[in-house]
Amino acid sequence: MSIFSYLLPKKQNTASVAKERLQIIVARERSTRGGPDYLPQLQEELLQVVRKYVPVDQDAVNVQVDRESGCEILELNITLPEG
């Protein structure tokens, strides 16, 4: 290993970056597939309610439905700003 390879690490090529991004998109699509049709509307309405009290970004509210042993679990994550 030369000193140059230590000081200047190899950059990721665009193919590997594109592959990682595609994997994220596919994982997100798989998680929303098969979910109830009302989830996007529920997420938007929850975001509007939270915005009445706290300024948050569009991506601050995450709604998921998980199915475990015959039960559906509604999971709600809201990322609030510090302060």
From Swiss-Prot:
Record GO biological process: cell division; regulation of division septum assembly
UniProt xrefs under SUPFAM superfamilies: Cell division protein MinE topological specificity domain
Keyword Cell cycle recorded: yes
Any Pfam family: MinE
Alphabetical UniProt keywords: Cell cycle, Cell division
Role summary: Prevents the cell division inhibition by proteins MinC and MinD at internal division sites while permitting inhibition at polar sites. This ensures cell division at the proper site by restricting the formation of a division septum at the midpoint of the long axis of the cell.
Family, similarity comment: Belongs to the MinE family.
Alphabetized NCBIfam families for the sequence: minE, PRK00296.1
HAMAP family membership: MinE (MF_00262)
Protein's UniProt name: Cell division topological specificity factor
Source organism (scientific name): Alcanivorax borkumensis (strain ATCC 700651 / DSM 11573 / NCIMB 13689 / SK2)
